[in-house]
Regions:
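HIT superfamily nucleotide-processing domains
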Residues: 1-113
Length: 113
């Protein structure tokens, strides 16, 4: 396994969770506080605290991660959806393990953030 932390909730979910999608190095799980009818989190197995540190992934792994985000949305039947990453406490990040929010199943307004 890639470097993980025993005290990290998301590291634990990558090892043992109710995955809606899985690929080598990445998992997707349902968000426990959904903001849309479909709201999943895409989590890399490797513990990287925030998007600021995305450079810890090499180019191939970064590409695979983005492809997995798109593949997860496809597998969930989403044609239109939102992908978000919260960076740091001021950006709304509460779990310090890089993850992508994939939200769909409803229309998002232009002025909405």
């Amino acid at each position: 396994l890639p470097p993980q932390r025993e005290d990290c909730l998301f590291c634990g979910l990558t090892r043992d969770g109710k995955w809606v999608n899985r690929a080598d190095g990445f998992v997707a799980v349902e968000d426990i506080r959904p903001l849309a009818p479909v709201h999943v989190l895409v989590i890399p197995e490797r513990h990287v605290e925030t998007f600021r540190d995305v450079g810890e992934f090499d180019a191939h792994e970064s590409k695979r991660m983005l492809e997995f985000v798109a593949d997860t949305a496809r597998k969930l039947g989403l044609d239109d959806y939102r992908v978000m990453v919260n960076v740091g406490p001021g950006g709304g990040q509460t779990i310090f393990h890089l993850h992508w929010h994939v939200l769909g199943g409803r229309r998002f307004g232009e002025a909405e953030t």
